[in-house]
């Protein structure tokens, strides 16, 4: 079992005079796992408030990504957002390797209510399956396939319409540890 509480001091990044004046951000994350013997289950959840996308200082760049699939923070046009996410997963030994499965859900909305850019609400669903196989004590191969579906809702005052982008990703590789 793990619990983490983080606070982000936005006043150290934004001075509130020439740029933004935001309340400090907060995340609370809980997670744990349990080994049932035949399979290991994982569960985690996170609450977040007053968070910003990685590139929140460049709202114009974010606006250009609205018609493509992006990190969900970019849907908020540089505004702070709040919400929660949950993730459940499982791994089990299969054919000498390990099969992996996970599902997740995120729900987020504007932290400050609506403004001139319009109110935004987002839901994201995701699922992934994978497999890893040890070739030796220090080397393994892996493959993962994932699918994510977003539902972005904008109010009438927004310059962007509602849209539901999705993405599918497949990757594979070999890992060697030293």
Question: Where is each model-derived feature located?
Answer:
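Extracytoplasmic/periplasmic mature domains of Sec-exported, cell-envelope-associated bacterial proteins
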Residues: 24-26, 125, 137, 149, ...
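Outer-membrane beta-barrel "beta-signal"
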Residues: 165-178
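Short Gly/Pro-enriched loop/turn and capping motifs at secondary-structure junctions
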Residues: 106-110, 134-138, 148-151
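A glycine-biased, small/acidic residue-tolerant capping/turn segment at secondary-structure junctions
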Residues: 112-114, 142-144, 151-162
């Amino acid at each position: 079992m793990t619990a983490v509480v983080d606070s982000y001091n936005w006043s150290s990044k934004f001075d509130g005079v020439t740029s933004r004046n935001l309340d400090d951000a907060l995340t609370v994350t809980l997670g744990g796992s349990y080994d049932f013997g035949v399979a290991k289950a994982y569960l985690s959840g996170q609450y977040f408030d007053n968070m910003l996308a990685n590139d929140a200082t460049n709202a114009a760049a974010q606006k250009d990504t609205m018609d493509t699939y992006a990190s969900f923070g970019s849907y908020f046009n540089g505004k702070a957002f709040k919400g929660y996410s949950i993730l459940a997963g499982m791994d089990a030994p299969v054919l000498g390797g390990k099969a992996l499965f996970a599902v997740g859900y995120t729900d987020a909305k504007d932290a400050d209510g609506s403004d001139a850019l319009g109110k935004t609400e987002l839901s994201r669903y995701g699922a992934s399956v994978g497999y890893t196989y040890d070739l030796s004590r220090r080397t393994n191969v892996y493959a993962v396939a994932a699918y994510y579906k977003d539902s972005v809702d904008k109010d009438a005052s927004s310059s962007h319409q509602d849209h539901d982008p999705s993405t599918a990703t497949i990757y594979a590789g070999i890992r060697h540890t030293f």
